[in-house]
């Protein structure tokens, strides 16, 4: 017989919660002012025209319009918004 009582030890419970990062509105999709376009850690995507950036590097729309992704110099990826008035005309 065992001279010590068996004590269970859990090896689970260490996983951190997912942060739900990534692109939320893709290129060509319509968005409204204030909509979050990209959640990211650091500047994986840089703000272009009509895009604001929060203190946690979240990119958001400043105007209503269509989302546009483009590659700038040195392979920098930019997100911009083509305003709704420009797309209608």
Swiss-Prot record:
One of its GO terms (molecular function) is structural constituent of ribosome. GO terms for cellular component: cytosolic large ribosomal subunit. The keyword Protein transport does not apply. One of its GO terms (biological process) is translation. Transmembrane segments: none annotated. SUPFAM superfamilies: Ribosomal L27 protein-like. InterPro entries: Ribosomal_bL27 (IPR001684), Ribosomal_bL27_CS (IPR018261). PANTHER family: LARGE RIBOSOMAL SUBUNIT PROTEIN BL27M, RIBOSOMAL PROTEIN L27. Belongs to the bacterial ribosomal protein bL27 family. NCBIfam families: L27. This is Large ribosomal subunit protein bL27. It comes from Bacteroides fragilis (strain ATCC 25285 / DSM 2151 / CCUG 4856 / JCM 11019 / LMG 10263 / NCTC 9343 / Onslow / VPI 2553 / EN-2). The gene is rpmA.
């Amino acid at each position: 017989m065992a001279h010590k009582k068996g004590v269970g030890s859990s090896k689970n419970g260490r996983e951190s919660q997912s942060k739900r990062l990534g692109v939320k509105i893709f290129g060509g999709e319509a968005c409204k002012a204030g909509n979050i376009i990209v959640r990211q850690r650091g500047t994986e995507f840089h703000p272009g025209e009509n895009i604001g950036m929060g203190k946690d590097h979240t990119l958001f729309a400043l105007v209503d319009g269509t989302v546009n992704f483009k590659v700038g110099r040195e392979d920098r990826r930019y997100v911009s918004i083509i305003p709704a008035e420009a797309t209608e005309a």
